[in-house]
Amino acid sequence: MKKTISIFIFLIFSLPFFAQGISDFFIYLPESYFSQLNPDQRRKLLNDSTVTNNYGGKSTLLALNEENNYIKVQTSGQGFFEVKKWTLKDSTALFAMSFWVCSPACDGGISFFKENYTPAMRDKNQFPSIKISDFFNRDSLAAKEISENDFKNRFDIFFIRFELQPSGNDILVIHDIQNYMNKEDYEKWKPFLKGNRLRLIWRDGYFEKGEVYFREE
């Protein structure tokens, strides 16, 4: 009996405790989500700040904030990767990973996980869907008699990235219209824009859309 208990305790303490902090989440994130670096390379990156990734390039640690549970990595010359942890009301953890590539317009995605990498926040009531129309003033478009179909046809491609925050719990959604449209077209549509950033406000368990505003890069 004592031997069985000892083996059980050994196994428990041998497993990585993902909920302890953001570093563990980053190191053990399955490679299907982050193939540039394996767990050993990620551990080395947190210690040495720069490593050679699986594609022969350099990946660089840009930020490591254990207190605020945030990590940011430049995976390549044009690629970026972030992870962030929130603590829910029931004391469980919620994690997010965000990535984007700029060439030159920036485009990326975001995924959420519970502990042990179970996908989370798939309900639109927890994380709202983002539309290009969120960034435009519909009344101004209607005043110029720009139809919904004309608008959708012009913006059938939508470049956005999700920036996690090193010192806060909100998320910034940033569109990159300026970099994928030619200058003449951008100047035509700019008067109808409300902004190039949409703040997603953290409400202790879900996000809701907040203000849209401009900020130059």
For the regions a protein language model found, what residue spans apply to each?
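Bacterial Sec-dependent N-terminal signal peptides
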Residues: 1-25
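Terminal domain-start segments
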Residues: 20-88
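Surface-exposed loop/turn elements that mediate protein-protein interactions on large endomembrane-trafficking
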Residues: 60-74, 114-125, 202-206
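Short, surface-exposed coil-to-beta transition loops
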Residues: 79-82, 95-96, 105-110, 155-159, ...
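Short beta-strand elements that form the blades of beta-propeller/WD-repeat-like
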Residues: 93-101, 169-176
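Mid-length scaffold segments of soluble, non-membrane domains
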Residues: 94-129
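Short aromatic loop motif centered on NTY/YTY
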Residues: 123-203, 208, 214-217
